[in-house]
């Protein structure tokens, strides 16, 4: 069963845990991740190219890894991962300036709801590029790939009460999602509340 002890056993000793690597040839016969991106009617190749340019300008040493990942056939999708704290902080310090620069230069006002999720799709690709770069440059992280679980009947929901001032500054967090992302949102919200 899934309980605290089982989860601790599953994650103990690993530096990074992600969803399994999916081969885009099996998802839809795509030859690489760029083609996979371009086939999605809600994603624009110009956005992927813009992020690539931002990444290569800010971090030229990542170009070889971006090329390998985007021209490659496999990636961990769903933006779901567990990392050692110091790796997580390093990843966020690297990731969010890239996403911020992209978002600042992008007009979201004429996008449909799904296309406004482009930043999330970009961050999926960036996770793979970050890991590829770190492994290529000698991080030697122990990486585990675990299946993504979709809970059909999670435990009954508890009623959430508004946070009082005893918690200090309260920061609202907003997600753009539909019913397909409820499991991921529930996990994210639970993690934020606990940490």
Regions found by a protein language model. Give the residues of each.
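ER/Golgi luminal nucleotide-sugar-dependent glycosyltransferases, focusing on the catalytic module
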Residues: 1-160, 164-165
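N-terminal anchoring/stem segment of glycosyltransferases
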Residues: 157-195
């Amino acid at each position: 069963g899934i309980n605290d002890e089982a989860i601790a056993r599953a994650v103990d000793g690993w530096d990074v845990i992600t969803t399994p690597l999916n081969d885009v040839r099996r998802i839809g016969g795509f030859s690489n991740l760029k083609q996979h991106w371009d086939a999605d009617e809600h994603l624009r190749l110009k956005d992927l190219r813009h992020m690539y340019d931002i990444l290569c300008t800010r971090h030229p040493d990542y170009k070889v890894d971006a090329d390998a990942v985007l021209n490659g056939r496999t990636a961990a999708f769903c933006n779901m991962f567990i990392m050692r704290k110091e790796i997580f902080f390093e990843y966020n310090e690297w990731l969010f300036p890239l996403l911020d620069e992209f978002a600042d230069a992008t007009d979201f006002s004429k996008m449909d709801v799904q296309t406004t999720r482009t930043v999330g799709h970009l961050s999926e690709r960036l996770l793979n590029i970050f890991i590829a770069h770190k492994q290529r440059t000698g991080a030697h992280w122990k990486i585990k790939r675990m299946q993504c679980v979709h809970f059909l009947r999670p435990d009954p929901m508890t009623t959430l009460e508004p946070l009082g001032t005893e918690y200090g500054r309260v920061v609202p967090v907003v997600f753009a999602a539909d019913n397909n992302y409820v499991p991921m949102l529930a996990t994210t919200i639970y993690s934020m509340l606990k940490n």
